[in-house]
Amino acid sequence: GGISLVNDPAASTYEALQTREAGARVIMIDPNIRLGFIAGVEDSYRARITRMIARADIVKLSDEDLHWFAGAGDLHALAQGILDMGPKVVFLTEGAKGAHAITKTLARFAPARSVTVADTVGAGDTFNAGALAALHNRGALSKAGIAQLDAGSLDAALALGVQAAAITVSRAGANPPWAHELGA
């Protein structure tokens, strides 16, 4: 997501890959919007992100990303608007507050872990890795699995995502945890 989806040829290549694989593979997108990189191309960037969200199964957005994309309002209502575009689950991170997993029928939350923050670079990517690993561990990382996520799977995804992100932000240099640090 983010920077790689701003300029061609990378942006159109990633979008073409997503289009080609969307029917056969679980697709996750984390737009990771960086305003400094989209200045002057905001309309085309928003259009590309809109198309890619519509083809994704899983969308991860920070609260700031969601407000940029969908406007002001209640986060859960805005996330439901994202789900109306096609994805099956929205992971919504709120930094030190924690993270949400939202589907058409479920809304789950995991509070952030209290840590001394050294560096926030990589927190979102590490959350994504933890959430995806948890879904994989539960046998839910398939088109069918994502379409019928239950509370236990969402809770597991949030728990591992939040745990992994907490470890990452507690040390400098976007240094994600090893499996043994997560009890995995």
Predicted regions and their residues:
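Conserved phosphate-binding/catalytic region of the ribokinase-like
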Residues: 19-20, 71-184
